[in-house]
């Protein structure tokens, strides 16, 4: 048993020793392989390093060669440029030398000429001295022979020449003036006749009545209303007389103000068509008619400017122009008259080479003040100038308005043409009627007197001027003041107006109290 254990131990020891040497040999073998591999790697790294070193050297040599080549080329270019600059400088130097030589030659030539001129000047001065002495000698001899001094002889000759020339100039001026007047008369007659022939005016005298047709005679009673309240309301609101007589199916509206008459006609037409006729409805329709008339006035103004070819007028001026449709002067419609004057002035301006459109503009606006002369103080010329200035019209237009009646001196040819065209249009046979104009002026004066008093809201001359109705403000005029106002207006009418028969003065003071039930 003990021998077995010993044998086992010996075997174990021997095995351990053998294993140790085997492992050592294996380790040494591995170490040797690793050394060989490391040496091989080192060798390969050395070869790669040598290759990279050679490659870097080659690249460095190539770069050095390129830089050297570029440097040599740059040096050659610079040398070439320097050579060119040197050549140019040498050429400039040669040119300067040649110019200097030429200047020296010219300087020598000029000096020679200057010397020759000095010699010639001295010779001329000597000759002038001799000539002056001879002239003085001859003048003294002439003065001795004629008995006149030099100044006396000059004055005598000048007087004689002046006398002859003055006579000839006067004759020439007289002949020129005669020819100019004859030519101007012929030219003016030709231009006026041509303008009149080319401007055809179709216009008849305005009337002071309008007729409203009725569907039947029963409508007359409804228009009059209970105890005449409807007709009174309509007449009070419009200031127009309603004449209801035996004329079948018609009502006549009479009034000198065409705008009021047109307003009344439209309102009455609407009332007849609607069938409801009572004071409240009448007020509503009259107000609606006023708006329609205002719109119609604007459209008339725009249509007129389009017809005449005048553009760029201020909208307010266009509306004022449209009001001229409802304004007459001696029975002649002022808007038609203004259009006629515009065309006549334009035609004459074109013949004379002036601005045709500016002449038309001045002719169209020459009576613009008549549209509101019954509302604003001053003559229609003053009002027209004020309107044209306010709306920045051309200075020629303003002067044409101011001078067309001779109140101001015309400053342009167009202003003279507008005045001539105005006279032509007014003087045309049948264009105006003096009697109608006087009648309308009397009615306007009636209203002007009534409205000049404080507290008067509106006044209407009706019944062909036989009555004036005055609407007063109830908060300013009481019943006693109304009677006093009527007396004062009556006295002024008697003092300032000439009229046939009697004029009834009616002062109306109306107070309304309105409440709404909810």
Swiss-Prot record:
The family this protein is said to belong to: Belongs to the RNase Y family.
One GO term (biological process): mRNA catabolic process
Matches recorded under InterPro entries: HD/PDEase_dom (IPR003607), HD_domain (IPR006674), HDIG_dom (IPR006675), KH_dom (IPR004087), KH_dom_type_1 (IPR004088), KH_dom_type_1_sf (IPR036612), Ribonuclease_Y (IPR017705), RNase_Y_N (IPR022711)
Compartmental location: Cell membrane
The EC number(s) this enzyme carries: 3.1.-.-
Gene: rny
Gene Ontology molecular-function annotations: RNA binding; RNA endonuclease activity
Full protein name: Ribonuclease Y
Topological type in the membrane: Single-pass membrane protein
Enzyme class, first EC level, given as a word: hydrolase
Domain KH: 208-271
Highest classification ranks of the organism: Bacteria, Bacillati, Bacillota, Bacilli, Bacillales
Matches recorded under PANTHER family: RIBONUCLEASE Y
Function according to Swiss-Prot or TrEMBL: Endoribonuclease that initiates mRNA decay.
Membrane-traversing stretches: 2-22
Ranges of residues in domain HD: 334-427
UniProt keyword terms in alphabetical order: Cell membrane, Endonuclease, Hydrolase, Membrane, Nuclease, RNA-binding, Transmembrane, Transmembrane helix
Any one of the GO CC terms: plasma membrane
Species name: Geobacillus kaustophilus (strain HTA426)
Keyword field contains RNA-binding: yes
Major location (coarse): membrane
């Amino acid at each position: 048993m003990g021998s077995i254990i010993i044998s086992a131990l010996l075997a174990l020891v021997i095995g351990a020793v053998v294993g140790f040497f085997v492992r050592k040999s294996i380790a040494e073998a591995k170490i040797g392989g690793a050394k060989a591999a490391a040496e091989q790697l080192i060798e390969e790294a050395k070869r790669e390093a040598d290759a990279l070193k050679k490659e870097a050297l080659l690249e460095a040599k190539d770069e050095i060669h390129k830089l050297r080549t570029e440097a040599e080329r740059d040096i050659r270019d610079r040398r070439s440029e320097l050579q060119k600059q040197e050549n140019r400088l040498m050429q400039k130097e040669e040119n300067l030398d040649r110019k200097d030589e030429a200047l020296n030659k010219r300087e020598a030539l000029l000096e020679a000429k200057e010397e020759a001129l000095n010699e010639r000047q001295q010779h001329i001065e000597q000759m002038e001295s001799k000539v002056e002495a001879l002239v003085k000698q001859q003048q003294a001899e002439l003065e001795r022979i004629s008995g006149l001094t030099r100044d006396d002889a000059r004055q005598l000759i000048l007087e004689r020449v002046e006398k002859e020339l003055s006579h000839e100039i006067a004759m020439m001026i007289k002949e020129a003036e005669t020819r100019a007047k004859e030519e101007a008369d012929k030219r003016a007659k030709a231009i006026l006749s041509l303008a009149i022939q080319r401007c055809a005016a179709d216009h008849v005298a305005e009337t002071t009545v309008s007729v409203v047709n009725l569907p039947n005679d029963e409508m007359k009673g409804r228009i009059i209303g209970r105890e005449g309240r409807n007709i009174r309301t309509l007449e009070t609101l419009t200031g127009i007389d309603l004449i209801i007589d035996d004329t079948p199916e018609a009502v006549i509206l009479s009034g000198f103000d065409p705008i009021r008459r047109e307003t009344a006609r439209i309102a009455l037409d609407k009332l007849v068509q609607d069938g409801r006729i009572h004071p409240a409805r009448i007020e509503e329709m009259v107000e609606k008619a006023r708006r329609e008339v205002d719109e119609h006035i604007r459209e008339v103004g725009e249509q007129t400017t389009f017809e005449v070819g005048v553009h760029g007028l201020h909208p307010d001026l266009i509306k004022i122009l449209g009001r001229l449709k409802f304004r007459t002067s001696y029975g002649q419609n002022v808007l038609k008259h203004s259009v006629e004057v515009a065309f006549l002035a334009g035609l004459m301006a074109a013949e004379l080479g002036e601005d045709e459109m500016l002449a038309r503009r001045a002719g169209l606006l020459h009576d613009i003040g008549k549209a509101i002369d019954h509302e604003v103080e001053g003559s229609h010329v003053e009002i027209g100038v004020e309107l044209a200035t306010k709306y920045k019209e051309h200075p020629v237009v303003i002067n044409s308005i101011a001078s067309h009646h001779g109140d101001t001196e015309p400053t342009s040819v167009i202003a003279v043409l507008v005045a001539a065209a105005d006279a032509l249009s007014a003087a045309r046979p049948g264009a105006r009627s003096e009697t109608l104009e006087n009648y309308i002026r009397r009615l306007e004066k009636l209203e002007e007197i009534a409205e000049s008093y404080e507290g008067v809201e509106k006044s209407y001359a009706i019944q062909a001027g036989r009555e004036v109705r005055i609407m007063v403000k109830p908060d300013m005029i009481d019943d006693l003041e109304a009677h006093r106002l009527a007396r004062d207006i009556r006295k002024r009418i008697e003092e300032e107006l000439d009229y046939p028969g009697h004029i009834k003065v009616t002062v109306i003071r109306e107070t309304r109290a309105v409440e709404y039930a909810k």
